[in-house]
Amino acid sequence: MTFRNLGQLHRTQAARLGPKPAMRHRVHGLYRDTSWTEYGDAVRACASALVAAGVKPGDRVGLLAENRPEWLIADMGIMAAGAVNVPCHAGIPAAAAARLLADAGASWLFVSNAAQLAKAREVRKELPAIRGVIVFDRSAAAPDAPAWAGFLQRGRDALRDTAAELDRREDALTGDDLATIMYTSGTTGLPKGVMLTHGNLLSNAEQVLDYAPKDVDIVLLSWLPFSHIFARLCDHYFSVRAGFLLAFAESADTLPADIQEVQPTHIHGVPRFWEKMLAAARAYPDPPKVLRAMFGRRIKWLMSGGAPLPPEICKAYRAAGLPLLQGYGLTETAPVLTINSPDEFRVESAGKAIPGVELKIAPDGEILARGPNVMKGYWNQPQATAEVLRDGWFYTGDLGHIDSDGFLYITGRKKDLIVLSNGKKVTPSGVENLLLSDPHVEQAVVYGDRRNFLTAVVVPNWAKVRQTLSLTGSDEELAKNPAVEEFLHKRVDAILAETAAWEQVKKFVIRPTPFTPESGEMTVSLKLKRDAIRTRHATELDKLYAE
């Protein structure tokens, strides 16, 4: 069946699947299920309440919350009312959230709890267009922020008056209508509001559906933030389109335990997650056996996205009998462009273009894409839109090549390309992936643009360093230990020995603490913010070139 919009899709699936479980989530420490009927009723109530509150088609509604069932219900409710969801990552500071919501012109805002409500109150004067705030947690409700439960009840009570209008709005919504504005977290510069239509998101969910196994009852354990397009499409909308059970991990920290309890068939993650799980397994005598056990007895599908997956990680999983595959996409493409399938894959590749997507490589190596999932443009930024949407193609900003079998290989970001003072060009991600292949290296970022050699900021795997060198002391103490510096220099030299001379890291800064989204040095999808890291370590890096 072809669907005109996401609201119609959800209502149809909820009616078709009825008592079957749609969501599984923890309540007071125990997992409980929400049926498709309950899910559909809640979405309808949310949409009704928004209409009764005066929300018009095309109005923007903000969503500032952690992953939880209410996030999905609010998302679908906003769109069922014909409005546009503007999600903010839960960890975003109040001032940053205010900038995004003000730019989008949000008129209503959903928040999850007291902490998020405090952010909203802190910047409320900067958001005069906000007419109301709804808080999911009943305990955090206040006169200026009514509780979610009461909001839904008002929606149910109003259905006698709003039902016909909801049906009219659903009928009027087309694939060209705006569904969401998703602000890119951005590794550099200010975030841009990516305008995705109902057609963009529906087409991508349909395209991904072709890869879903037909012989298994899918249980997908979701943990990546829904404010990021990877989880929003590949977990949320994919589960609605395919009609399978979406289980919620309690948190990223509890994910290993949640896997054992839920016993999922599918998990999606970013490279950092797969690396950490592999590192944990390698602490035991039989890593492949331990790694298999860590993902439960029912696992059928592990998909990596959000950033390039180092080939060594993929090989280790496949050697353990785990079907880890890599895909590629961007927020601007809703997001999936390519997928490795279980039947057709290349370890080093990001896979083949999904049905309906065309790819080509520009003369300078940039990957270009077109298809029904490519965004409408950037909100209020026509010049930025014109720069990336040209002659019917979306210019991804990524570099790569396509082999004779149609597999895409990502080699780096165009803007990250390092040009040394001798004119030699280096793709930093390639060097970084080699460094990360050493178990003693936790994180690494390479620099050297317009310099005469490469340098890096390296975060060691301190547990492994302590074990190998039989050392004690804090991370900060070890970072200053000459024995550690000498050891790591030998490791780096050995790792890069087979690379070209200009691709070798001559000197580096040893950093005791990891890069994180909280430190402002990674995006929410765990991509390095190179400029932020360089700024923080500018003095140390400059000294390396002065020595």
Feature annotation, model-predicted:
Residues 202-222, 226-290, 298:
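Conserved AMP-binding/adenylation subdomain of ANL enzymes
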Residues 353-420, 425:
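Conserved ATP-binding/catalytic segment of the ANL
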Residues 19-21, 135, 153-183, 190, ...:
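Conserved pre-ATP/AMP-binding loop-to-beta segment of ANL
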